[in-house]
C-alpha cells in the first residue's frame, strides 16, 4: 500500500491555502486518509516527483479528491497534499458504481 509506513502530513502555507481555496480543511483532508481510500498513480503530473490521486470520504462522510506526493525526511515518509476538492455528485455516483462492480467480482 502506498501510504503504509507514513508518519504524517507535510503542510506549508502554499498547499494549505490551495486545499482551503477549494473548501477542504486540513482536518477534513487528513481524516480521509485515516479511512479507506482508492489511490492511483498520476503519471500525467509526475514530471519532477511521483504523484498520486486519492479518492475517499472525510470523517463527515463527504467525498474528496486529493492530489498528493510522498516526501521523505530523515528516514520518515510524509504525505504532502498538492490540492484537494470535494467531488461533484456525478463523480461520486461514477466512483460508487465502479467500486460496486469491483465488489461484485
Predicted features along the sequence, with ranges:
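Ribonuclease/tRNase effector modules and their secretory precursors
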Residues: 1-105
